[in-house]
Amino acid sequence: MVTIKAVFDNDTATNLILDGDGLDGFANGAKLDLLRAWWAFTQGTAAANTGDCKIDFVGASSDVTALFLSGTGHYDGSAGAIKAAATNTTATSSDIKGTTRGTSGFVILEFRKDEAYA
């Protein structure tokens, strides 16, 4: 299991929130499946701010959205894990990024390593 917490303070950016090749047992092409998530977000102060956060699995040519979050909530995993569907066989194959638009708050993400991890 891998659990991370990302905190945002009136942030409008794309942030790498998990650098997967730094995890124990990483091998190129290894993936992380999203098991559970908890979040609480509010909108920033600028008029164009939305107060949301998009969580992506980083892909080789395009990223794949895992969750699009706003407000307060949780995903308890009872519907099953959200599989890492990004096509990637390089050192970024387990990377996770978050994109925010005028967002303050946090997200806690719990992942499971796939069988490619040693």
Description of each model-found segment:
Residues 31-43:
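A short beta-strand element within beta-rich, extracytoplasmic domains
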Residues 43-69:
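Short, surface-exposed beta-strand/strand-loop-strand elements in extracellular ectodomains
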Residues 1-26:
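Solvent-exposed, flexible loop/coil segments flanking beta-strands in beta-rich domains
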Residues 63-82:
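An anionic, turn-rich surface loop/hairpin at beta-sheet edges
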